[in-house]
Amino acid sequence: MFRFLFWCALVVGIVIGVLRATAIRWWRVPSDDPYLTASVSPSIRPGDLILLWRLTKPAFGDLVLCPEPKRPERIVIGRLVGEGRDEMEVNGGEIVVNGRRQNIESSCPIKTFSEHDPETHIEVEQRCNIEDINGGHFRGEIPPSSVRPSDVKTTVPEGDVWLVSDNRLYPYDSRDFGPVPRETCKELIFFRLVGAGGFFDTKTRNQYIP
């Protein structure tokens, strides 16, 4: 019996090791970068332990983790919404790709959430909606009383991708650092193992991230 358990544990360990080396890695969302953490809410939050998939090329609508183009030591996270030669428009919270506007499906189950302004550190309440991209994902809306980010209209260069933050009030995305070389965006965020509250926080444990 002991030998059987030993071999089972060994096989499981080898499988996990192979996956860890080739297909999957885990990463914890930092809590010391207010611009990054504000830009990714409400999809992921500071302290989340998330899984990254590395074997398939990220597609339209995927949430990806990439090095910032001009500062590769810095990590950026965004929704892949444009590729080479796509005509991009970002108007406040709205995204238009090649003339097609990405629509809102419904409100999120959480309805509203709070996020800290990365500059003033004041807590701001935002509405959460589900955006119809890649099956639907959470999107933080811009309150009517807030100053909305700058609009942009551009063509994505060949070989690059365009990233947009899920939090439309506090974005840190391609409007700030420009298009990102596709070859550097190889990791897709797809699962949350645990949240900042740890294993016993069942509300944030073992969740698929669209």
Regions found by a protein language model. Name each.
Residues 2-8, 13, 17, 23-210:
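Soluble "head" domains of membrane/secretory-pathway proteins
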